[in-house]
Amino acid sequence: MSTNSQKIKILVAEDETIIRLDLVEMLTDAGYEVVAQAENGAIAIEMAKKYQPDLAILDVKMPEVDGITAAEQIISISPVLMLTAFSQRELVERARDAGVMAYVVKPFSIGDLVPAIEIAISRHRQMKTLETEVADLYERLETRKIIDRAKGILMKAMNLSEPESFNWIQKTAM
């Protein structure tokens, strides 16, 4: 389990009650905190919004809303790990396209889940960090474009050199 002092919070969505209860017990015994359980994708989406888990573990085949369709919405809240008996290429591709971070095929053991859980959460955090960095760089680039346009206007209007117009902008901004 993660070395963080806080337990990783997990949402479990599985329509088969016995499998869901076994999974919850396995996760709890491994040191994870199961904050919500759902028997279908629609409830999983509601629970994800309500509890904001660190990870959602979803079965693919569930009533009402299937796991992959639910994952498409949950992915904006937390990373998703698919846990399913189905390994058909079409399902794996749908899960990949939905943004799922891991895909574990049943039967499974906790030894199969822990690495998938830890890697999914780690990759999700890395992606969020990169998204923040990209947004920051984009903002800085846009600011730079505005400054360059302002320099051009000053150079023309006040007959200044580029360094002089930049200095004028710096002094005026302070």
Question: What is the predicted role of each segment?
Answer:
Residues 46, 65-78:
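Short amphipathic alpha-helix used as the core "switch/output" element in two-component signaling
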Residues 1-9:
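Non-catalytic signal-transmission and effector/linker regions of two-component phosphorelay proteins
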Residues 69, 87-102:
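Alpha4 helix (beta4-alpha4-beta5 surface) of REC/receiver domains from two-component response regulators
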Residues 122-126, 132-174:
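C-terminal output/effector regions of signal-responsive regulators
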Residues 59, 84:
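Active-site residues of response regulator receiver
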Residues 40-43, 54, 61-69:
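Acidic catalytic/metal-coordinating carboxylates
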Residues 5, 16-36:
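Two-component/phosphorelay signaling modules centered on CheY-like receiver
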Residues 90, 108-117:
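C-terminal output helix
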